Amino acid sequence: MTNIRKSHPLFKLINDALIDLPAPSNISSWWNFGSLLGICLLIQILTGLFLAMHYTSDTTTAFQSVTHICRDVNYGWVLRYLHANGASMFFICLFLHVGRGLYYGSYIYTETWNVGILLLFAVMATAFMGYVLPWGQMSFWGATVITNLLSAIPYIGTNLVEWIWGGFSVDKATLTRFFAFHFLLPFIISALVVVHLLFLHETGSNNPTGIPSDMDMIPFHPYYTIKDMLGALIMILALLLLVLFSPDLLGDPDNYIPANPLNTPPHIKPEWYFLFAYAILRSIPNKLGGVLALVLSILILALMPLLHTSKQRSMMFRPLSQCMFWLLVADLLTLTWIGGQPVEHPFIIIGQLASILYFSLILVLMPLVSIVENRLLKW
């Protein structure tokens, strides 16, 4: 008689994805982030669900309801800060996961990669709308500034913005619909995650060498289940340290001031995980150009499979490409720093140079360096 986990239709699904899944024997800790992202999503959905039980999406009471959650609801402050800092953890894992994909050439699995880009966009949209919900100063002005960018679209721009707002400014209708979409999107993300895994399990995982590992596979359980549990433990510990010791470290103090349409904060800036894109947006003086650069800064990832000129898949044995990759990482950190700075003399030019370098590295320098490495292989 066959084992129930291999014969039962439902258990078979779980078995094929988490237990008997053949996995390369040499995947490193950089392959942990997929499962960590799954845990982040679960934490966000659960904490978000309980927060939604106490939150009211009305402009007059939204800020007050968040205060009520923190003061009067049992462990409401834990829920609120787990949710807010959980988003930061989510993005840290996302960036590391994408970085791993770039470094080891995982983008060669184009379907998995493209669904991943869709997921990145969906998570960014969810995070943006979630930031609006507490209805503080930065919530209101962030929503106003970012939605206003759509007015740069020729002909339909202004109508589109007013349609999204549900009026002539960010108001009750905007907050209500953002809450509705913020609640809905994580479930769409969950569905996309299933599609992402479906495509991944068609090809199997990549590994650090970038060489096919079909002849040397091991079962996912117990080897990688225990490895993932260690990663999860470290991440949850880091999240709890953040939540319990410095919950407001990554937030903006302006968001503790209730939204006031008559008073603009001195520096409008998004959460830290959007600062790199915000810096690229600000570095172009033209509105439409800035919006296009903003979208392309993420969409450019879809070109990675086309820009792969190397004969090797992974960067593991390509020192010149490694230099380019780490230069890209340093450039993104520079952009993140610039995004949080005021628009003043030294920062403007640094932001513009960093933006030019970002696109140059991905579109020109990395493919060129790969061609040079191919030539070096012939020597």
UniProtKB/Swiss-Prot annotation:
<dbReference type="InterPro" id="IPR048259">
    <property type="entry name" value="Cytochrome_b_N_euk/bac"/>
</dbReference>
<comment type="subunit">
    <text>The cytochrome bc1 complex contains 11 subunits: 3 respiratory subunits (MT-CYB, CYC1 and UQCRFS1), 2 core proteins (UQCRC1 and UQCRC2) and 6 low-molecular weight proteins (UQCRH/QCR6, UQCRB/QCR7, UQCRQ/QCR8, UQCR10/QCR9, UQCR11/QCR10 and a cleavage product of UQCRFS1). This cytochrome bc1 complex then forms a dimer.</text>
</comment>
<dbReference type="GO" id="GO:0045275">
    <property type="term" value="C:respiratory chain complex III"/>
</dbReference>
<keyword id="KW-0679">Respiratory chain</keyword>
<keyword id="KW-0349">Heme</keyword>
<feature type="binding site" description="axial binding residue">
    <location>
        <position position="83"/>
    </location>
    <ligand>
        <name>heme b b562</name>
    </ligand>
</feature>
<protein>
    <recommendedName>
        <fullName>Cytochrome b</fullName>
    </recommendedName>
</protein>
<keyword id="KW-0408">Iron</keyword>
<feature type="transmembrane region" description="Helical">
    <location>
        <begin position="77"/>
        <end position="98"/>
    </location>
</feature>
<dbReference type="InterPro" id="IPR027387">
    <property type="entry name" value="Cytb/b6-like_sf"/>
</dbReference>
<feature type="binding site" description="axial binding residue">
    <location>
        <position position="196"/>
    </location>
    <ligand>
        <name>heme b b566</name>
    </ligand>
</feature>
<feature type="transmembrane region" description="Helical">
    <location>
        <begin position="347"/>
        <end position="367"/>
    </location>
</feature>
<dbReference type="GO" id="GO:0008121">
    <property type="term" value="F:ubiquinol-cytochrome-c reductase activity"/>
</dbReference>
<feature type="transmembrane region" description="Helical">
    <location>
        <begin position="113"/>
        <end position="133"/>
    </location>
</feature>
<keyword id="KW-1133">Transmembrane helix</keyword>
<keyword id="KW-0249">Electron transport</keyword>
<feature type="binding site">
    <location>
        <position position="201"/>
    </location>
    <ligand>
        <name>a ubiquinone</name>
    </ligand>
</feature>
<comment type="function">
    <text>Component of the ubiquinol-cytochrome c reductase complex (complex III or cytochrome b-c1 complex) that is part of the mitochondrial respiratory chain. The b-c1 complex mediates electron transfer from ubiquinol to cytochrome c. Contributes to the generation of a proton gradient across the mitochondrial membrane that is then used for ATP synthesis.</text>
</comment>
<keyword id="KW-0812">Transmembrane</keyword>
<feature type="transmembrane region" description="Helical">
    <location>
        <begin position="288"/>
        <end position="308"/>
    </location>
</feature>
<feature type="binding site" description="axial binding residue">
    <location>
        <position position="97"/>
    </location>
    <ligand>
        <name>heme b b566</name>
    </ligand>
</feature>
<dbReference type="InterPro" id="IPR036150">
    <property type="entry name" value="Cyt_b/b6_C_sf"/>
</dbReference>
<dbReference type="InterPro" id="IPR005798">
    <property type="entry name" value="Cyt_b/b6_C"/>
</dbReference>
<dbReference type="GO" id="GO:0046872">
    <property type="term" value="F:metal ion binding"/>
</dbReference>
<dbReference type="GO" id="GO:0006122">
    <property type="term" value="P:mitochondrial electron transport, ubiquinol to cytochrome c"/>
</dbReference>
<comment type="similarity">
    <text>Belongs to the cytochrome b family.</text>
</comment>
<keyword id="KW-0830">Ubiquinone</keyword>
<keyword id="KW-0479">Metal-binding</keyword>
<dbReference type="InterPro" id="IPR030689">
    <property type="entry name" value="Cytochrome_b"/>
</dbReference>
<dbReference type="InterPro" id="IPR048260">
    <property type="entry name" value="Cytochrome_b_C_euk/bac"/>
</dbReference>
<dbReference type="Pfam" id="PF00033">
    <property type="entry name" value="Cytochrome_B"/>
</dbReference>
<dbReference type="InterPro" id="IPR005797">
    <property type="entry name" value="Cyt_b/b6_N"/>
</dbReference>
<dbReference type="GO" id="GO:0005743">
    <property type="term" value="C:mitochondrial inner membrane"/>
</dbReference>
<feature type="transmembrane region" description="Helical">
    <location>
        <begin position="226"/>
        <end position="246"/>
    </location>
</feature>
<keyword id="KW-0999">Mitochondrion inner membrane</keyword>
<feature type="transmembrane region" description="Helical">
    <location>
        <begin position="33"/>
        <end position="53"/>
    </location>
</feature>
<keyword id="KW-0472">Membrane</keyword>
<keyword id="KW-0496">Mitochondrion</keyword>
<feature type="transmembrane region" description="Helical">
    <location>
        <begin position="178"/>
        <end position="198"/>
    </location>
</feature>
<dbReference type="InterPro" id="IPR016174">
    <property type="entry name" value="Di-haem_cyt_TM"/>
</dbReference>
<dbReference type="Pfam" id="PF00032">
    <property type="entry name" value="Cytochrom_B_C"/>
</dbReference>
<feature type="binding site" description="axial binding residue">
    <location>
        <position position="182"/>
    </location>
    <ligand>
        <name>heme b b562</name>
    </ligand>
</feature>
